[in-house]
């Protein structure tokens, strides 16, 4: 077969570190021991020239890693990747320098792809026309929205005329007009016989455009071949997956990881086996290092003690200092006891992840009452804790007074800290959203405290009722959602906003609490609690929840 792309037993893994120091230490003392995440594990496939392959799979299955391997952004740990021709990767802001303008990025990317300056000057007008972002082409890319970055990245990549085009979710943030323009361009490439890899969560786009499908499932190729057959199989799987609770999804992931030997492998056990195989030679090597380090430490300690012996007055060991030390110690104990009392009296807990089930009983199999998300705050009863099936549960009170149970893995004590930002910071956020989504974004927080009837009467647009959440009545208008509890507006949520994480931090500064794995951030102002939650790709902020204190 005359293939264009060929993967043979390819494995890509990443070492996990508990803290930055471990990573630094690994630079000097290379060690294969530790935990690894296997993004791709022993995958093989061939793609003939002219095929358009749709790559589907759940988040974390290795789709973006696969696209990076095809584009040459990263190299495999094992196996071979054979690419015939040049490949261009199109992802949101991929390869774009935020400090440079759009024009400067075109020149930079063209030069990196080996295009002459004369040729770059020829294609710049075509790229400007295709991207259609107006005067922003002459502004730094860091000021762009996700959609504008996607437009520029796509325009550059298709006009440098690559042999292989890799599109990683780049069409997910554009409007329908631009998406159609992109699909038309991709069809041109298809007619020219170019090979295209199309990564998307939109099964309709994959089915209508692609000629083959590759289903990645937790680092393995589950199916590869006929587009209709594989998309139908994946769609059936998604329907079942979407009906699962968060706990059931995590159980499925653990089961698949165990089956495919993928993800967080049990490196402790393999590490011990590896150490035994190294034998006495390695043991002697490390023993010499330990002896050397111990000797240096003893020498330093001896020098410090000798200095202290001859210069006693430099050391604060007189009786007065001892007395002061005792007084300070008593004060610290008293203060510590007071802090413990305060903590015991605390009645607020905060959810630290998204999509967490609140159960009727302290059991994962009991009826689900509601779904809680990162930043939701609940009151609890001190004594109402229960341990069942090795999982500790805590009883919480919903907004409507209903009692429910939530696993303590997903909730933690909420404490206000000194990192409280000004209310004006929220105004900066709504002012930015106003420019994109309209004036209602700015006025939305003014409806706090209004009854449902007052809200429906004074709000300029019709409000659509939605199913209740965590004990709140929900009504919505476009990107704005209101939460009503005890007939008062208590929450405003801006949805589908596609804000970059860098822009969020630029507007609000340092967060009070974060979930770095899911890219969720919690802020506290003098009057509000603000929870910024990322989308499923964890690449940008999808919603911002505002709750009045």
Curated annotation (Swiss-Prot):
Disulphide bridges: none
Matching NCBIfam families: PRK13545.1, PRK13546.1
Protein name stated in the entry: Teichoic acids export ATP-binding protein TagH
UniProtKB keywords: ATP-binding, Cell membrane, Membrane, Nucleotide-binding, Translocase, Transport
Gene Ontology annotations for the cellular component aspect, listed alphabetically: plasma membrane
Naturally occurring in which organism (per UniProt): Bacillus anthracis
Similarity field: Belongs to the ABC transporter superfamily. Teichoic acids exporter (TC 3.A.1.104.1) family.
Record-linked Pfam families: ABC_tran, SH3_3
Residues holding ATP: 57-64
């Amino acid at each position: 077969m005359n293939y264009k792309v060929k993967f043979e037993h390819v494995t890509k893994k990443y070492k996990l570190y508990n803290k930055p120091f471990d990573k630094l230490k690994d630079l000097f003392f290379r060690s294969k021991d530790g935990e690894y995440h296997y993004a791709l594990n022993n995958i093989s496939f061939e793609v003939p020239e002219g095929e358009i392959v749709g790559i589907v799979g759940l988040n974390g299955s290795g789709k973006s890693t696969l696209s990076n391997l095809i584009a040459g952004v990263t190299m495999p740990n094992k196996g071979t990747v054979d690419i015939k021709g040049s490949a261009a990767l199109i992802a949101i802001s991929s390869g774009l320098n935020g400090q440079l303008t759009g024009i400067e990025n075109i020149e930079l990317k063209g030069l990196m792809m080996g295009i002459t300056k004369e040729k770059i000057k020829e294609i710049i007008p075509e790229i400007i026309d295709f991207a259609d972002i107006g005067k922003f082409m002459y502004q730094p890319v860091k000021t762009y929205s996700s959609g504008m970055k996607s437009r520029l990245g796509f325009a550059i990549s298709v006009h440098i005329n690559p042999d292989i085009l890799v599109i990683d979710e780049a069409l997910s943030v554009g409007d329908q007009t631009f998406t159609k323009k992109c699909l038309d361009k991709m069809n041109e490439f298809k007619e020219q016989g170019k090979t295209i890899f199309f990564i998307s969560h939109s099964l309709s786009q994959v089915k209508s455009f692609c000629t083959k499908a590759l289903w990645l499932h937790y680092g393995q190729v589950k199916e590869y071949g006929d587009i209709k057959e594989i998309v139908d199989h994946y769609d059936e799987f998604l329907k079942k997956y979407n009906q699962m609770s968060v706990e059931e999804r995590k159980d499925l992931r653990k089961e698949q990881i165990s089956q495919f030997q993928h993800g967080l492998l049990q490196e402790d056990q393999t590490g011990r086996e590896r150490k035994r195989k190294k034998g006495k030679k390695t043991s002697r090597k490390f023993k010499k290092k330990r002896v050397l380090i111990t000797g240096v430490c003893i020498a330093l300690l001896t020098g410090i003690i000798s200095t202290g012996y001859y210069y006693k007055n430099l050391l604060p060991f007189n009786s007065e200092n001892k007395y002061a030390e005792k007084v300070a110690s008593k004060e610290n104990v008293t203060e510590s006891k007071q802090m413990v009392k305060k903590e015991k009296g605390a009645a607020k807990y905060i959810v630290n992840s998204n999509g967490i089930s609140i159960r009727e009983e302290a059991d994962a199999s009991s009826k689900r009452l509601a779904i809680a998300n990162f930043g939701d705050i609940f009151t609890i009863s001190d004594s109402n804790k229960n341990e069942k099936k090795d999982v500790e549960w805590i009883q919480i009170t919903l907004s409507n007074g209903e009692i429910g149970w939530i696993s303590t893995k997903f909730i933690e004590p909420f404490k206000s800290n000194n990192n409280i930002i000004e209310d004006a910071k929220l105004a900066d956020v709504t002012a930015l959203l106003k420019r994109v989504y309209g004036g209602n974004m700015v006025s939305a927080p003014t409806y706090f405290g209004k009854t449902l009837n007052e809200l429906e009467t004074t709000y300029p647009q019709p409000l659509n009722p939605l199913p209740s959440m965590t004990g709140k009545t929900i009504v919505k208008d476009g990107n704005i959602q209101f939460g009503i509890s005890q007939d008062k507006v208590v929450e405003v949520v801006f949805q589908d906003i596609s804000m970059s994480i860098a822009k969020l931090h630029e507007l609000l500064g340092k967060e009070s609490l974060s979930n770095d794995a899911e890219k969720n951030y919690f802020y506290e102002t003098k009057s509000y609690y603000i929870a910024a939650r990322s989308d499923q790709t964890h690449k940008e902020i999808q919603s911002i929840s505002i709750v009045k204190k």
